Amino acid sequence: MAAAKIETAAEIAAHGAPPPAPVQTQSYRESRPQIVGPESPQPPFPIHLSGLVQRGFGRGGKDLGCPTANLPDESISPLSSVARTGVYYGYAQVIPPAGEDRPLLEDEVKVLPMVMSLGWNPFYHNERLTAEIHIMHAFKSDFYGFELRAVVLGYIRPELDYVSREALIADIETDKSVALNSLKRPDYQKFAVDSHFQLS
């Protein structure tokens, strides 16, 4: 019997309201792997994204301790057109505009590990599809309007709903750990110097 086709995020968005997401359970949390994906990225990965950072909902840093950078709708179509909703991992880089009077520090313009949520964030009942990227670095200031480039290398887990904010935060922390572990493999590390990025 053929496996059921998994709808892409763009296909779900075309239907209107997304279907209800499954609720995360204790057994799911305890059974999560610490490394995901094959030994090297497989199609449709790598997926290259870029766009100017937009203001989002402002809750990633405030509510969850996980500040995110939002890409405009047109910038996420290379991913949403081929991938399901859920959490992904890879690398990202923030590039300041020429002459910007809000300069980033030297270690803030490097290519850095990231995790990304693609979906509707059911815990917050979003009404539209978004891609929210968390770069694993403590930036000293915001970078709205700066260019963000990302290379998406793999899938971590499906989009879930949560019984509490604490359960969501715990899963986010696990996502970050899984991403870092998964990116340690040689065939993933080489994408930190991908030609998509601005390398000195």
Specify the residue positions occupied by each region the protein language model found.
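Phosphate/ribose-recognition catalytic cores of enzymes acting on nucleotide-derived substrates
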Residues: A2-S200
